[in-house]
């Protein structure tokens, strides 16, 4: 069921959810980075920007948060993200690429589940199979798509595939954790 966004000249409204590393605001040592927001796509978005544009997705904003900060302020972070989704009328929450960063994948899955339960926005978590515990806990609750670990082969294809799934051009079963 393709959404035909490009044919109608519309764009699918998307918010990106990154940790501080993927947003470009520091390394693992900055896990306490507070919830922040940048207009448009920043950081790792540049890896799949072309795929987004080709598929008719538009990055409204990049939400970023350190996993340690999230764990200490879950309710506040989820509440603010939910309100942003409602305000922007975002249709998709793109949480990733999480690679094999366990704390980021856990944060992404928890936020994705809350957003799925509290809004009409469709969340997608993109992470590597090394996040076994998070995948086992959330794969039947939210859409979790597979990608290689950091430094792994096939990153470009995995991110392009995730975008194709979101835009309706590819079936999610081809990349979803089973």
Per-range role (PLM):
Residues 2-178:
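An N-terminal assembly and electron-transfer interface module characteristic of large anaerobic redox
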């Amino acid at each position: 069921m393709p959404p035909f966004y490009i044919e109608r000249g519309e764009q699918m409204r998307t918010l990106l959810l990154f940790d501080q590393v993927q947003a470009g605001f520091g390394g693992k040592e900055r896990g306490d980075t507070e919830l922040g927001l940048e207009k448009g796509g920043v950081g790792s978005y540049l890896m799949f920007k072309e795929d987004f544009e080709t598929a008719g997705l538009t990055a409204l904003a990049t939400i970023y948060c350190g996993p340690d900060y999230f764990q200490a302020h879950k309710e506040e972070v989820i509440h603010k993200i939910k309100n942003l989704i409602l305000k922007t009328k975002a249709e998709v929450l793109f949480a990733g690429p999480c690679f094999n960063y366990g704390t980021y994948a856990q944060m992404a899955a928890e936020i994705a589940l809350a957003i799925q339960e509290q809004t009409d926005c469709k969340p997608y978590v993109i992470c590597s199979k090394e996040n076994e515990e998070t995948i086992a806990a959330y794969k039947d609750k939210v859409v979790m798509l597979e990608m290689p670990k950091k430094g792994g082969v096939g990153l470009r294809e995995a991110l392009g595939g995730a975008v194709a799934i979101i835009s309706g051009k590819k079936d999610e079963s081809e990349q979803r954790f089973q």
